[in-house]
Amino acid sequence: MATAVGGGSDVEVGFAKLQGEDFEYYMQSYSIILGRNSKKATVDVDLSSLGGGMNISRNHARIFYDFTRRRFSLEVLGKNGCLVEGVLHLPGNPNVKLDSQDLLQIGDKEFYFLLPVRSILGGPLGPRHHVSGQTSVVPYHNYQSGPGSGSGKKGVRSRELYEYDDEDDDDDDDEEDDMRGSGKKTRRDGHEVVYASGEKKREGRSKVDREADDQQFLQLEEKDVVSSVATVLSDLCGPGEWMPMEKLHSVILKEYGNVWHHSRVRRYLSQEDWAIPEAKGKPWYGLLMLLRKYPEHFVINTRSKGRVTLEFVSLVTLLS
């Protein structure tokens, strides 16, 4: 199976997972672009290389977490549109709410959008509508089963056995709630469903678990930012070359300023969170502090001109 792991990491964790017949992608950032790579730009998921056919635009669709509505959504960008559960959505239409196990088709490529069942830390995934703010999105592993689980049949429509954990479904009745707590099996829409054992109504996770999840989230966010910086430096710098932090900040801001969540932009691309003299006039200060945490990947060089200190950065691989 061809594997595309999000965020430049080979760790199988993320906020959500895309599962096709011959590929999987772990979403490790707030927003990803699906489409096809070109000479000038790359996308997070290159569906053209995965057999998506000729009707895929460079930037065909965007899957992102909508913090206002606390849910994942699909924005259609490509002129040929996207199918979600058999319904065609075109550019200019309202963004599409994505539920776990929704079947998407872009071009000739079909795949499922899956949300996790359990947290990285082993605890149950609490009700999503009880969590607020940035921590609405926490990285998880152990996803609901993708296409063709245990069936051996060709094609992504052969989903059979999976765990069902769509707690945003307002149509669940009392009988289903009882089964959620008992660990029993029932059938839903012609498919066998396995409910995980646990409390009938989950009351959310402990403060310690939430803090641990927050820390895990920040680590994944750091990896995503570091991966983005490394990509920019490798594309724009040759062997032995350095890039001024001011220029790096400008490139990153242009490339990701409208893609990253505003809290990430504020943390790494502005000086709002850094009320200290050293950060004055340096909106890249947060980014600089992050890169200093990874000396195995980045080399920071400083030069002073009077009272002004200039920072330059390069990749270890470009200087070795």
Swiss-Prot record:
Disruption phenotype: Slightly enlarged leaves, small siliques with few seed set, severely reduced fertility mainly due to reduced stamen filament elongation and defects in pollen development. Increased polyploidy levels in cotyledon and leaf cells. Widely expressed. InterPro entries: FHA_dom, Fhl1/FHA1, SMAD_FHA_dom_sf. Its main location: nucleus. One of its GO terms (cellular component) is Isw1 complex. GO terms for molecular function: histone binding. Residues 163-178 have a biased composition (Acidic residues). The modification N-acetylalanine is found at A2. One of its GO terms (biological process) is regulation of ribosomal protein gene transcription by RNA polymerase II. Residues 138-211 are annotated as: Disordered. May play a role in the control of plant organ development and specifically in the regulation of stamen development. Does not show transactivation activity in yeast. This is FHA domain-containing protein FHA2. It comes from Arabidopsis thaliana (Mouse-ear cress). The lineage of its organism: Eukaryota, Viridiplantae, Streptophyta, Embryophyta, Tracheophyta.
